Curated annotation (Swiss-Prot):
Any one of the GO CC terms: plasma membrane
Domain of life: Bacteria
Comment, domains: The HXXXXD motif is essential for acyltransferase activity and may constitute the binding site for the phosphate moiety of the glycerol-3-phosphate.
UniProt keyword terms in alphabetical order: Acyltransferase, Cell membrane, Lipid biosynthesis, Lipid metabolism, Membrane, Phospholipid biosynthesis, Phospholipid metabolism, Transferase
Reaction equations catalysed: sn-glycerol 3-phosphate + an acyl-CoA = a 1-acyl-sn-glycero-3-phosphate + CoA
HAMAP family tied to this protein: Glyc3P_acyltrans (MF_00393)
Lineage of source species: Bacteria, Bacillati, Actinomycetota, Actinomycetes, Mycobacteriales
Main location: membrane
EC number, UniProt record: 2.3.1.15
Record keyword Lipid metabolism present: yes
Biological source species: Mycobacterium bovis (strain BCG / Pasteur 1173P2)
Record-given protein name: Glycerol-3-phosphate acyltransferase
Pathway, per record: Phospholipid metabolism; CDP-diacylglycerol biosynthesis; CDP-diacylglycerol from sn-glycerol 3-phosphate: step 1/3
Gene from which this protein is expressed: plsB
Membrane topology annotation: Peripheral membrane protein
Amino acid sequence: MTKPAADASAVLTAEDTLVLASTATPVEMELIMGWLGQQRARHPDSKFDILKLPPRNAPPAALTALVEQLEPGFASSPQSGEDRSIVPVRVIWLPPADRSRAGKVAALLPGRDPYHPSQRQQRRILRTDPRRARVVAGESAKVSELRQQWRDTTVAEHKRDFAQFVSRRALLALARAEYRILGPQYKSPRLVKPEMLASARFRAGLDRIPGATVEDAGKMLDELSTGWSQVSVDLVSVLGRLASRGFDPEFDYDEYQVAAMRAALEAHPAVLLFSHRSYIDGVVVPVAMQDNRLPPVHMFGGINLSFGLMGPLMRRSGMIFIRRNIGNDPLYKYVLKEYVGYVVEKRFNLSWSIEGTRSRTGKMLPPKLGLMSYVADAYLDGRSDDILLQGVSICFDQLHEITEYAAYARGAEKTPEGLRWLYNFIKAQGERNFGKIYVRFPEAVSMRQYLGAPHGELTQDPAAKRLALQKMSFEVAWRILQATPVTATGLVSALLLTTRGTALTLDQLHHTLQDSLDYLERKQSPVSTSALRLRSREGVRAAADALSNGHPVTRVDSGREPVWYIAPDDEHAAAFYRNSVIHAFLETSIVELALAHAKHAEGDRVAAFWAQAMRLRDLLKFDFYFADSTAFRANIAQEMAWHQDWEDHLGVGGNEIDAMLYAKRPLMSDAMLRVFFEAYEIVADVLRDAPPDIGPEELTELALGLGRQFVAQGRVRSSEPVSTLLFATARQVAVDQELIAPAADLAERRVAFRRELRNILRDFDYVEQIARNQFVAREFKARQGRDRI
């Protein structure tokens, strides 16, 4: 038989060693025996015994030989017994180096798994490509060390239980040796269920839950376990490319960020928290890890996605399906918490959406703390000396799901997931080109930095712990936003939404966009390659055309030159793209509104400016992320630095403020924020004569009806603010203002709140007029230039 390759780690050094051979076929045993013969030849004075490792879930009788070998003083050698070394060994089979994408898919068929070839296939491999067979040895351990671990970590006492423990440790050691050869992307937790059920820690917690049984806990662990396989790992990239085939095949990464994350993941386990705009995100993260040869992630997903053949396949690719609404099931909550802790303790990486669900508006939602609290508990309990929270920004040039989101905004119901839904989803990806997918990895947040050392004060103070979790989660989300590149799609959509259906020419689009690009360059904000191309007329044309045909822009080219506009029915879809770039213009938009407010203020206009800036921040806090108050004030001051002696000019007021705003480039508040305050104002108008404790559904229905009336009357600029999604946060604002609870002065405060919002909308009108004057002046100047030519 042709000799296989041996891994460098597959060398025996101890004088008395028991080799546990994990084999599935006689061919593998022959290879291991050949390797063992080489070891005996190198160390003629050493004693190497070999025993076939019992398979998982082997009957008690299969463990008899191992039980005997583990008995103290079993062998005659003086070094035998407790000082004897245990070394697990197996043969791994590598896939062909030139395997195609079709070959990876074919591996799903019976008998085609390249990692587990049949005996006949193994003999053929050894004849034709023996380098694909490799003998590997796991890390060795002394019997005494294993016995001490067994006593410290399990509740078992029988010597047969010890043999099972040694078998599990051997398989885990082999798994580690295997992924060192195959690559970090194949790293996955093994034997989770038997390890956890045998754990003294787990069983002690189980005893504290009334009515809990080991059997029920085991079933829940089966539901959570991933059942990872190498073939499924290979399929991750194939399925990922299939689901994202409408995009450029290569994802856009920042190589410096990838290198920094690789170094961080070598030191600590991590939770990858990604922004969530599309179902595609679920494949983007695993593919991104594979693309960059990084350890895989075990991604949490709703059990509603575990349907048909996709459920088992996604499980074997690392998806952990969790139930929803688990508040009344203490056993499930406990098992899930311990499962998360176990995975973290074993230094595997987890991943889920920091927002908990897809953002159907295009902007980031507030972070959800449920799973995060379980990870924090594992850290505070000392299961890791630190855990990194690695943000992941995922953004797209375009998404086909915006049509669905626009329907949600108008009040439509969510389409249930299923095989038909999956077919339609994948089919839609191939209908046209959606541009690029941008993946960014900002600097990770250290859990130790926010929660202190393990076993610290937060373990005894739930309120302080929750506050620390909130601050930590918001910091992750903030870093995600700061790393998210501004796209051409977002900028073009934002501009065309401001025209309220009036079409713009290519020259008008091009010269108006330059102010925004200049601002982003001054701020050193990250921008996509598509946004960089907006510097040229050709880049603007390409961006506008990519959005045309109702996606969501309409192009008219039946006249002298093409023009582009957004029709009323497409405003909700376009708003998704606009909302994805608001974070880059949020503070400068607030500056404009605060200046407009100060123009009409009595007394100290500088104080009025700052008071209004902080008030706007407070009103918008449910829709957007902000820096803390101190940093926010510093950012606003920096935004005003474009105008020399701005406080002096602001204090004068009147025409000085007009001049300040006219000189400001760009003016973005109307484009970015108006729609949110219009939605707030609609809800405030509904509250005028609504019951004190009006429910969310009733409030939304009334707001939809009133909003449609306002659109018909021209009392709002477009149909965009008439959105169930915006009304949901508008209600949060009202609750925060204590306007949805019985009170003696409730009616007066509701009227006052509506008046405040109308005054803010008046400020929008003021800034918008100045922006229009800027546009007209640019048009006049451009026309003069063309006339000279």
